């Protein structure tokens, strides 16, 4: 089954990554997880005061809709802490996990 990804890169302007990750987990994750087609969500510290937000969706349309969901959440919750650098929506060729994590 084809999956689709939304990947966004942000500059961290204020605070630290761990604070933002906890806020995203507690506030953004519940919003995304209620959306049709939601598969996975995570954030990663990619260094140089940047972070990456990753969501995986069942359809490309759902991935594209998540761009607007994320934008609204950022505006309402962390607009003073992060600045969007770029967003990508694409088709995920594959995503494999170790049996320990599957």
For every predicted segment, state its role.
Residues 1-52, 58-72, 78-102:
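Short S/T/G/P-rich N-terminal loop/turn motif that feeds into the first structured element of a domain
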């Amino acid at each position: 089954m084809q999956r689709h990804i939304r990947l966004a890169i942000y500059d961290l302007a204020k605070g630290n990554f761990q604070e933002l990750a906890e806020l995203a987990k507690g506030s953004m994750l519940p919003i995304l997880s209620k959306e049709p087609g939601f598969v996975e969500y995570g954030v990663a510290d990619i260094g140089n005061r940047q972070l990456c937000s990753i969501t995986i969706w069942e359809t490309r349309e759902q991935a594209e809709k998540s761009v607007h969901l994320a934008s609204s959440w950022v505006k309402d919750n962390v607009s003073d802490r992060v600045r969007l650098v770029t967003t990508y929506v694409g088709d995920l060729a594959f995503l494999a996990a170790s049996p320990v994590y599957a």
